[in-house]
Amino acid sequence: QGKIILAVFLLLVAAAALFLARLSSAGQALGQPGLRLAAMELHNEDSQLVRTNGVALPAQIFDCTSKPTPVTKLELDWLPRDTTYGRRRYSFPDKTWIESSVVLMGQDRTSIHKPEYCLPGQGFTIDLREVVTIPIERPHAYDLSVMKLTTSKRARDRNGREVPLRGVYIYWFVADGKLATHHLDRMWMMTKGLLSEGVLQRWAYVTYFAICKPGDEDTTFDKMTKFIAESVPKFQTATGPRKN
């Protein structure tokens, strides 16, 4: 019985995706983002200007220094032209870093894809997937449900020696007044929005990524949760239900 229910759900989601594609191409009204946008210059790997606005990721968090990171040519070629980006790397005094990235759709919903597609292309193997919650205190207390991926790869150090690396990758989806942890949930909410309101919800996916040595995954995740709790209220306007 469980398999039948799952099959019906997946069939409904597939039908919803087809329905979305047809409605999107018909030029539906585009909803507001659940993130703050700002005028800024974003560049590709060759330092060429590619955008003059983006997601307003904060420049200062804790005692980190930060700098914008490039939007890759692969992304610019693959994703729709009306995609909006946010990209920043935050460096800690201990030489570790956390990279934050946002991809925000425009009228073309295909900007939003499963982040799991990106990691294997960068040489990472996904070892563990789990849904976790991160407490956020502003503008009110709520729990942010996110997907946590623990990853691994082998890389070469400065001396050319092959060494094992671990990565912690955290992501979720956000639109105006809406949050989602799973890709299918986001698609379903988008479909309901089109049917009930006639508005194409403007979804984004937000990611945070850090690498570490094997055995340091829990410490790295703890650092990331504190960082996310501090940074999210500075650029994300959508929130979860208020905690009692």
Language-model-detected regions and their locations in the chain:
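Alpha-helical transmembrane signal-anchor/signal-peptide segments
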Residues: S25-V50
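Intrinsically disordered, low-complexity regions
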Residues: K3, Q28, L35, Q122-F124
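A generic secondary-structure signal marking the coil-to-beta-strand transition
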Residues: F62, T96, R202-A204
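Generic detector of ordered secondary-structure context
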Residues: L49, A56-L57, D82, G198, ...
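Short, solvent-exposed recognition patches
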Residues: S47-Q48, T65-S196
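A short, solvent-exposed beta-edge/loop patch
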Residues: G2-K3, L11-A21, T133-N244
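Amphipathic alpha-helical segments
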Residues: T52-P70
